[in-house]
Amino acid sequence: MKYFGTDGFRGEANVGLTVEHAYKIGRFVGWYYGANRGAKARVIVGKDTRRSSYMFEAALVSGLVASGADAYMLHVIPTPGVAHQTVEGCFDCGIMISASHNPFCDNGIKLVNSDGFKMDEDVLELIEDYIDGKGEVPLATGNHIGATVDYMQGRNRYIASLIASANFSLQGVKIGIDCANGSASSVAKPVFDALGADVRVINAAPDGFNINVDCGSTHMERLQRHVVEQGLDVGFAYDGDADRCLAVDERGRVVDGDQILYVCGVYLNKHGRLSGGTVVPTIASNFGLIKSLELAGLSAVTSGVGDRHVYAKMREGGYSLGGEQTGHTIFGDIERTGDGIMTSLRVMEVIRAERETLSQLTAPCKLLPQAQVAVRVVDKDAALENMGVQNAIAEAEAALAGEGRVLVRKSGTESVIRVLAEAPDQAAADAAMKRIANALEAL
């Protein structure tokens, strides 16, 4: 598609994604759902803490009400909160304004359908046609103009649902959380407070510009220091819209999404709660995870990269747990998309039930050394088709001699090529990755 990628319509604010785009999305969505139901559409809208999110919210909501839809404004909330409240409140559609883990200068618009799933591609194609001037939709007039509704109660209901999902106490547990100066800033602490935890929060003072800046799940160093210096039992880091979660164990070591899948998969299987005894990682997951799951008596079925593909594979096979190394973890029995705060609660459930530390729980999961880099390019397709790049990939694979692998793919959200190399030792992984990265950088 022209505008919508794997995680919505994303770009630099007022460059790749403009207020005109946001207004037109609102105009089409407001008309489309109203026409389909024969009555005013009800659309719920959330945002993250970027300065531009307020601008895009105003444009989007203007488009919605101009087309006759009622717009319910959740204000700042995690992306999974929008999906949750879309379903719980029986809304026609949910819209989240966020660029997730990207820098503050970027932003994005994600849409979910009434079932809380990412919007169907046929609807997104219709929106793209309207953005490009193919067809018109009528403006509402008189009492058919939509209303804007302050829907803070929706965020409170989402917080309450997170608390209610935990059937355990965290009394006496010292937990560090890094909110990335994003959507988790006003949501995560109340959840852990309600469960009795001693919560030590960092990076929860958003100013519109500091979202994801040297913090959150893409910059774990500060949380690692925080856990060690404060003597905490565990730490959790979210990204800008809190659909990702990575952890830090009591020793200050990062626990990535693959290890979280292992810990939760083994626990759920032990208690008969893992459908088919199967976990759904992605093709970018560490091969060590696959082997560790097999040694624990579990199966793994891989999906494409992206939580959309993970959940599609889970639905296809009736599986209940899947996720990505980056921290998108989906518990299919209770959610339809990755939820960072829910993930941290599920990890705490395992820690409390098994009476083990996070380092003890992850110890059996033996991951292979990896080297990863994202190389910015002008044309992603041309870069992958370049003969020099293809030769570098072949040479890297030959050097690994079947004892490792390389994965080179284009990002679905940024103009970058992602390079992953995996090998029995770190030096070999680094060498394979650098060989390919150098070829890409030479373009």
Residue ranges of model-derived segments:
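Phosphate-binding and adjacent anionic-ligand microenvironments
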Residues: 234, 271-443
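General beta-strand structural signal in soluble alpha/beta enzymes
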Residues: 4-5, 45, 71-75, 96-97, ...
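Gly/Ser/Thr-enriched, mixed-charge loops and adjacent short helices
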Residues: 12, 107-230
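An N-terminal, well-structured beta->alpha segment
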Residues: 1-62, 66-67, 148-175
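N-terminal small/polar loop signature for handling phosphorylated ligands or for N-terminal nucleophile
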Residues: 31, 35, 42-106, 190-248
